[in-house]
C-alpha cells in the first residue's frame, strides 16, 4: 500500500466442478487497514455474474492466438466449437492458420483436446504460412447428423492480407478457395477438404468466403451457409449459399445488401430466411429476408435501427416455440452492444420476429475489450450457449438459462 488512494480488484476463479449455470454477485462491505476501518469507494456494480470456461488461451497447443468462433449442437447433444488456430500471431490470412475444433459431451462443462479439422500444410511446395485456411462456419445437417465446416483457403499471396490480395479468377494461384470438410462421427474425425469454388464463385469476384459462425438446416432439409464476396468493383456483399442434396452441390444467387460482410442466417418461418449482416456503414446491423433462397431480398423493418454494432461479426439463431422452455418463438442475438470498441458482449432476445429487443430480454456477459466475435447454439430446451472472444480468453464458453433472458 501507498499513502493516499489505493486501488484493488476482486477476481473470482471457479472450481472445476462448479456448474456453468452458477450465478453470483460481488460486493465489498468493509475493509480494515492496521485493524482500523478504511474508507471504501466502491466502483464496482452488484450485477449478476456468470461462470464461464476459457476453452482456448494464447499459447495453447503452441499457437499464438485463436480467433473466429463457430458453435453448433449436434443431434447427439455434443457441442462443437470451431475457430482459427493462428500459430504465429493474431493477424488475418494470409498466415500460418488452420481450423481447430473443440468438443464437449457434457453441455460445455469440460472440453476434449483440440482437433485439427482442416489444414493445407505445405501444399504446392509453399510453406505452411502460405497455405492458411480460416474464418470457419459450421453446420449440422439435422437430417443425417453430418457436420460440415466451410472455410477459405489462401495459397501464396506473400503473407499479404487475403482481403486485399485475393484476385479475380478461379484457380488457387489467383484467388481464395472455398473449402468444405465433413464429419460423420459427431465431430471426432474429419474428411479431406472438398473444393466447391467452381460451384459458387463468379470469376470476376476478388474474394468469396463464408460468413463465419454457423449455418443452418431448414425445415425442408436444405443446408444454408451465410457467405460474403468482394465483387468486381471491390465492394463486399453478404448473401447465402445452399445445398438441396445433403451437401453434394451448392448454389448461390444474389447479394442481400451491398457493402456488408460477415452475416448470420436464421429460418424465421418455414421457407423464410433472415440474414443479419455486419454493415460497413457502421452504427447498426443490416437485416434482410428472402423467400426464394436468395434470388430476391427484402429489407426488414428493423434493418439499420434495432441492433447497434461497432462494425463486427455477430450471431443470430431462431428457436421454435416447441423447442424451448418459454413456449415462444425466439430470435437470439449476440454481439458487442456498442457502436465504438468491441466490449459489452451481450445476448438479446426478440419475441416479435426481430422487430424489438427489449432491455428486459438482455444479459451482458463481458464489459471489457476483446476481439468481440461470438456464436450461439441451444444446449437444450432451457439453455443457450455462447462461444466468444472475451476479454479474458481467446475462446470463452458460457451457458445462460432462457428464463434469465426472456422476461
Residue ranges and their predicted role:
Residues 13-15, 31:
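Beta-strand-rich extracellular modules
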Amino acid at each position: 500500500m501507498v499513502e493516499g488512494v489505493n486501488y484493488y480488484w476482486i477476481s473470482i476463479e471457479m472450481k472445476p466442478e462448479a456448474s456453468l449455470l452458477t450465478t453470483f454477485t460481488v460486493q465489498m462491505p468493509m475493509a480494515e487497514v492496521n485493524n482500523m476501518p478504511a474508507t471504501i469507494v466502491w466502483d464496482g456494480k452488484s450485477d449478476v455474474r456468470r461462470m464461464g470456461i476459457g476453452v482456448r488461451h494464447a499459447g495453447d497447443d503452441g499457437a499464438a492466438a485463436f480467433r473466429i468462433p463457430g458453435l453448433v449442437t449436434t443431434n447427439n447433444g455434443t457441442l462443437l466449437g470451431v475457430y482459427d488456430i493462428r500459430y504465429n500471431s493474431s493477424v488475418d490470412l494470409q498466415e500460418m492458420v488452420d481450423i481447430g475444433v473443440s468438443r464437449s459431451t457434457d453441455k460445455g462443462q469440460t472440453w476434449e483436446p483440440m482437433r485439427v479439422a482442416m489444414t493445407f500444410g505445405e501444399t504446392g511446395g509453399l510453406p505452411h504460412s502460405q497455405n492458411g485456411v480460416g474464418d470457419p462456419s459450421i453446420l449440422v445437417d439435422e437430417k443425417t447428423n453430418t457436420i460440415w465446416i466451410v472455410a477459405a483457403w489462401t495459397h501464396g499471396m506473400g503473407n499479404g492480407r487475403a482481403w486485399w490480395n485475393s484476385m479475380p479468377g478461379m484457380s488457387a494461384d489467383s484467388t481464395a478457395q472455398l473449402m468444405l470438410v465433413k464429419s460423420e462421427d459427431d465431430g471426432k474425425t474429419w474428411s479431406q477438404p472438398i473444393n466447391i469454388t467452381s460451384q459458387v464463385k463468379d470469376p470476376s469476384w476478388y474474394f468469396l468466403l463464408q460468413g463465419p459462425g454457423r449455418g443452418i438446416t431448414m425445415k425442408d432439409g436444405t443446408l444454408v451457409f451465410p457467405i460474403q464476396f468482394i465483387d468486381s468493383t471491390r465492394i463486399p456483399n453478404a448473401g447465402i449459399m445452399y445445398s438441396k442434396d445433403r451437401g453434394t452441390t451448392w448454389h448461390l444467387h444474389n447479394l442481400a445488401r451491398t457493402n456488408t460482410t460477415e452475416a448470420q442466417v436464421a429460418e424465421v418461418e418455414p421457407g423464410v430466411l433472415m440474414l443479419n449482416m455486419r454493415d460497413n456503414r457502421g452504427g447498426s446491423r443490416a437485416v434482410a429476408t428472402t423467400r426464394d433462397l436468395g434470388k430476391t431480398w427484402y429489407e426488414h423493418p428493423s434493418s439499420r435501427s434495432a441492433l447497434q454494432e461497432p462494425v463486427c461479426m455477430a450471431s443470430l439463431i431462431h428457436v421454435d416455440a416447441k423447442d424451448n422452455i418459454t413456449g415462444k418463438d425466439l430470435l437470439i442475438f449476440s454481439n458487442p452492444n456498442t457502436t465504438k470498441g468491441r466490449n459489452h458482449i451481450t445476448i438479446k432476445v426478440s419475441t416479435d420476429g426481430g422487430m424489438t429487443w427489449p432491455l428486459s430480454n438482455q444479459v451482458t456477459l463481458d464489459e471489457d475489450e476483446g476481439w468481440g466475435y461470438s456464436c450461439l447454439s441451444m444446449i437444450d430446451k432451457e439453455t443457450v450457449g455462447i462461444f466468444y472472444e472475451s476479454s479474458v480468453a481467446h475462446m470463452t464458453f458460457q451457458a445462460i438459462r432462457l428464463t434469465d433472458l426472456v422476461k
